[in-house]
Amino acid sequence: MDLLLLEKTLLALFLAAITAITISKLRGKPFKLPPGPFPVPVFGNWLQVGDDLNHRNLTDLAKRFAEILLLRMEQRNLVVISSPELAKEVLHTQGVEFGSRTRNVVFDIFTGKGQDIVFTVYGEHWRKMRRIMTVPFFTNKVVQQYRFGWESEAASVVDDVKKNSKASVNGIVIRRRLQLMMYNIMYRIMFDRRFESEEDPLFVKLKALNGERSRLAQSFEYNYGDFIPILRPFLKGYLKVCKEVKDRRLQLFKDYFVDERKKLGSTKSTYNEGLKCAIDHILDAQKKGEINDDNVLYIVENINVAAIETTLWSIEWGIAELVNHQEIQNKLREEMDKVLGPGHQVTEPDLEKLPYLQAVIKETLRLRMAIPLLVPHMNLHDAKLGGFDIPAESKILVNAWWLANNPALWKKPEEFRPERFLEEEAHVEANGNDFRYLPFGVGRRSCPGIILALPILGITIGRLVQNFELLPPPGQSKIDTSEKGGQFSLHILKHSTIVAKPRAF
């Protein structure tokens, strides 16, 4: 370290210490701040709580302190919400005040500092992006237009598993085939494109880049440099890799999908409105000057992550729980056989006639919530919450997993028991009508993908259970359902091998 850098570092440490001491002295005077561990100069609470701020660790902190707690990470304030009443305040009652988004140093790179829809600040740009994305993605018309494609993709999964001789004996990692299915479902909607197999070179390249993006973004290992600016130089290599991955992904989206669709559109003498795919609507908005080239690519970026990955995680969790709870799997199969008739493959219109299947989906989303802390919220200005002062630009984490797994709010929440949604919790829906259960959030910044995710989950899990007896591999009574958490993700740690024995109809 040269002398100039050393001087700058020491000066930064001194100023940070003075700032931290000054702020800590403000606690309880002009500001009534939420409770939490006492911060130390420069590092705040980072030395006490570390980098791994997953839903379970934050639950433990809430039990120690309060349903609203404040963590100071040097320059960042993290407010953790752990009660339905406070969640309602953040997401609904004060939805405008807390409707913005905070980003960290890595998400700044992957979203172009909020040029997407998920991580943009609340305001005119967000409203414009939401409007542009709603028509091609998030309406019942889209569901009805594409449901036959979803059913076809699910049927292809069933056929491929039946053809795989290993599936019924030693088992297969079915997630790999389901991943192809999810890409085909969403790329049909986005680009009217699909991949023929898991070996398709473009699919392999796309999957690898998306996987690397997720690994880099969801890791906790860069938190120290995000929380503590004086440590940020140590992230230089990490952030360089993030930028390289971001550039390669956006170039791939542009070269192989967006530009290809532009060429296709320009060669058509007459354009059939009924055949428009999502990117056509988005490119129309670009031509009108509503969004720019970068916005188009960041919308594609969001769909690759927010739609494909989260739904895939939930499908994988649902299958794992059914493998480990054979009595529930059998009960679900019996319902479909009774209501639809043996051999009649479940379709999107059938889902409303299958309450136990719906309950299985709800219970999967409750116990194994894909986004357990929701996407972080932020207040642009000083605000009040639960009788406390919340400083401007605080990162608000709603621990939705704990709201749905708190034994004070749910009967035996640690159990996978779909019956709860047919009995004591029969009124609870996934759309946020009960603030104990928020798998998609609620309010202005809720996940609009709920309208796609629920039928895709129902069709996929329904067809697998209809056509196969899903079992652990030989020598195991259950499969491993250990969790792997991320910045705000929750997926299964090990992609387990599943035995799929075809049923005879």
Curated annotation (Swiss-Prot):
Keywords: Heme, Iron, Membrane, Metal-binding, Monooxygenase, Oxidoreductase, Transmembrane, Transmembrane helix
Gene Ontology cellular component terms for the protein in this record: membrane
Protein location: Membrane
Any Pfam family: p450
Molecular function, one GO term: heme binding
Annotated positions binding heme: C447
Reactions the enzyme catalyzes: (E)-cinnamate + reduced [NADPH--hemoprotein reductase] + O2 = (E)-4-coumarate + oxidized [NADPH--hemoprotein reductase] + H2O + H(+)
Transmembrane segments annotated in the record for this chain: 3-23
Expression triggers: By wounding.
Reported cofactor(s): heme
Principal cellular location given in the protein's record: membrane
Gene Ontology terms: biological process: lignin metabolic process
Pathway of action: Phenylpropanoid metabolism; trans-4-coumarate biosynthesis; trans-4-coumarate from trans-cinnamate: step 1/1
Function according to Swiss-Prot or TrEMBL: Catalyzes the first oxidative step of the phenylpropanoid pathway in higher plants by transforming trans-cinnamate into p-coumarate. The compounds formed by this pathway are essential components for lignification, pollination, and defense against ultraviolet light, predators and pathogens.
Family statement: Belongs to the cytochrome P450 family.
UniProt name for this protein: Trans-cinnamate 4-monooxygenase
